[in-house]
């Protein structure tokens, strides 16, 4: 990461935090109970909060992987990825959405 990129990242974060009201995280300060876990591709063109019109923290649990994969392997067994399983088991989330996108290079590579 270049110094310019790091500076821009920090400036963007400062603008973001400065734009929030002081009580923005008050409702989720003591824990989270998201309604939905949404697994998408980690592609930078797939912004989850915008896709689901999320206006406040706490409603959407947002993991992402290359190619929106929800499986992992442990001891030779196929299991649900922990970033999807955690909200379903530990936070009471009842809905899981797996979202792909047009032109996904990971999916294309897997199919070829």
Tell where the protein language model's regions lie, with residue ranges.
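Short HxH-centered metal-ligating active-site micro-motif
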Residues: 58-112
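Short, conserved "active-site rim" segments that organize catalytic pockets and cofactor/ligand binding
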Residues: 2-78
